[in-house]
């Protein structure tokens, strides 16, 4: 008779967030070694990764806030560029400049107090910066205002507004 010793399952002492951090890095390395490219071309995986690093709760809905910090909903932006920057793309054009400004302040950028910008090097976060909405609006509103007339007139190939927050602006305001 062969006695089989029943193994007790090991307790996993890692939180789901810690497990995600570990698996995220392993998946990236595997894809890199196989020449498969960046497995996270859509920003959602980076949002989940950033939330784990920052101790935030990821939003389970794909619309609205990316995550929630101690002050409420927050916005995440990430880049793999050599210099940190953030882009706000696909901003809907409103009927008047007053409506456009109100939309940005109340419904889009100003809706979330904290905006977090991360720069990735491979699977690692090289830097994360936090800007508050009033500072982001100080940067973004003049850029939107400059694009607004052409976008509003319908003479642009892409009718939506897109603006970039530069490295210099992030460093100055963050």
PLM regions and their residue ranges:
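Nucleic-acid endonuclease domains
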Residues: 1-174
């Amino acid at each position: 008779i062969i006695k089989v010793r029943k193994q007790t399952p090991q307790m996993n002492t890692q939180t789901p967030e810690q497990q995600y951090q570990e698996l995220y890095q392993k998946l990236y390395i595997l894809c890199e070694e196989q020449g498969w490219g960046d497995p996270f071309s859509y920003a959602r995986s980076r949002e989940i990764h950033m939330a784990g690093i920052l101790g935030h709760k990821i939003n389970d809905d794909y619309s609205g806030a990316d995550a929630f910090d101690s002050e409420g909903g927050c916005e995440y932006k990430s880049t793999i560029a050599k210099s940190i920057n953030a882009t706000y793309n696909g901003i809907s054009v409103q009927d008047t400049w007053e409506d456009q400004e109100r939309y940005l302040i109340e419904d889009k950028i100003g809706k979330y107090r904290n905006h977090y910008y991360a720069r990735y090097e491979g699977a690692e976060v090289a830097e994360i910066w936090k800007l508050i909405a009033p500072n982001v609006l100080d940067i973004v509103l003049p850029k939107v205002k400059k694009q607004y007339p052409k976008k509003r007139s319908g003479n642009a190939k892409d009718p939506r507004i897109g603006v970039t927050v530069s490295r210099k602006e992030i460093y100055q305001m963050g």
